[in-house]
């Protein structure tokens, strides 16, 4: 990710789980638990797909999102950190 274009963490996270099709558990503010894969999102809602069915979930109703697998964010920054560590040990 270039440093001149800032993205918010929410968009980076949702885009990462969308691209990798990582299964998620989403807890709503009323306690309902939803599970599925993010297929699309915008500023106000997330489209969650499970068993061939889609659910449109409004972001203001979401309390917590738990991915089923680790999510890698800011991969370019991680590569820069690794390179800096290698040169420091040389």
Swiss-Prot record:
RNA chaperone that binds small regulatory RNA (sRNAs) and mRNAs to facilitate mRNA translational regulation in response to envelope stress, environmental stress and changes in metabolite concentrations. Also binds with high specificity to tRNAs. It holds the Pfam family Hfq. This is RNA-binding protein Hfq. Homohexamer. Gene3D superfamilies: 2.30.30.100. One of its GO terms (cellular component) is cytosol. Residues 11-71 form the Sm domain. Keywords: RNA-binding, Stress response. The keyword Transmembrane does not apply. The gene is hfq. NCBIfam families: Hfq, PRK00395.1. It comes from Maricaulis maris (strain MCS10) (Caulobacter maris). Belongs to the Hfq family. It comes from the Bacteria. GO terms for molecular function: RNA binding. GO terms for biological process: regulation of DNA-templated transcription; regulation of RNA stability; regulation of translation, ncRNA-mediated.
